[in-house]
């Protein structure tokens, strides 16, 4: 495999992953960032040579990415589809549906352990910003929402989340790297939104939860064509890696 400093995806997050999975994560980051452009044909031999691996893990990686619909497997090789603004918006559509459903279940259960867990994660997010660690902030941000999803113990909701997570995580990583360098003040808004989430769950207040969800997701939807969600922004996220 490539040296960790040459990778876009944080290598420490994949210490126990198979070679194929690690190749998939790196290729995904390159595709989402636009470093590998839509329409590019990926060759098993070329990828294997670049990553210093055999073709078997490369095939595994390409199958993973094909299942996520960001590449298409054809006879001549794997054709990159990429991540469009429409796809980003659709990911957030599904997240809004998921988290709205989950909240309806949360009001029926004991949420004290969940509130404690979310409060801890939020503190870690604050520490990450204090030390200007965009990658750790991204990890904690995804973990925050995943912890909410897991709290209702719903296997099919979890399955949908697991399918969304890889591409969504790549997008979040790249966008947070740019925010840290160019729009640091925006983290205050993000942290405030997460505080609102916790308060809504703690009080089981549906109106507050709807407010917190829409504050988070409508902000994204309204800006789908803006710099933060454009290919230019994602490419910048790749440039800012390991700065």
Curated annotation (Swiss-Prot):
The keyword Transcription applies. Keywords: DNA-binding, Gluconate utilization, Repressor, Transcription, Transcription regulation. Pfam families: FCD, GntR. One of its GO terms (biological process) is D-gluconate metabolic process. The keyword Lipid biosynthesis does not apply. Residues 44-63 bind DNA. One of its GO terms (molecular function) is DNA binding. InterPro entries: GntR_C, TF_FadR/GntR_C, Tscrpt_reg_HTH_GntR, WH-like_DNA-bd_sf, WH_DNA-bd_sf. Residues 17-83 form the HTH gntR-type domain. Transcriptional repressor of the gluconate operon (gntRKPZ), which encodes the proteins for gluconate utilization. Represses mRNA synthesis by binding to the gnt operator; the binding is suppressed by gluconate or glucono-delta-lactone. This is Gluconate operon transcriptional repressor.
């Amino acid at each position: 495999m490539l040296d960790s400093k040459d990778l876009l995806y944080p290598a420490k997050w994949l210490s126990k992953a198979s070679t194929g999975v690690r190749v998939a994560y790196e290729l995904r980051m390159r595709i989402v960032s636009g470093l590998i452009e839509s329409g590019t044909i990926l060759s098993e031999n070329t990828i294997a040579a670049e990553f210093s691996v055999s073709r078997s893990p490369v095939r595994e990686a390409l199958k993973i990415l094909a299942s996520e619909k960001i590449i298409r497997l054809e006879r001549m090789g794997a054709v990159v589809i990429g991540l469009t603004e429409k796809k980003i918006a659709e990911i957030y559509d599904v997240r809004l549906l998921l988290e709205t459903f989950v909240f309806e279940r949360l009001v029926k259960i004991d949420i004290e352990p969940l509130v404690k867990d979310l409060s801890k994660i939020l503190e870690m997010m604050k520490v990450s910003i204090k030390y200007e660690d965009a990658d750790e902030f991204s990890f904690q941000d995804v973990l925050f929402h995943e912890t909410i999803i897991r709290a209702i113990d719903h296997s099919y909701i979890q399955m949908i989340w697991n399918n969304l997570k890889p591409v969504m995580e790549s997008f979040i990583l790249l966008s947070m790297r740019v925010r840290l360098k160019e729009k640091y003040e925006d983290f205050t808004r993000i942290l405030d939104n997460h505080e609102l989430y916790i308060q809504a769950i703690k009080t089981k207040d549906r109106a507050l939860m709807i407010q917190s969800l829409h504050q988070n997701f409508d902000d994204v939807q309204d800006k789908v064509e803006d710099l933060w969600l454009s290919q230019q922004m994602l490419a910048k996220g790749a440039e800012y890696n390991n700065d």
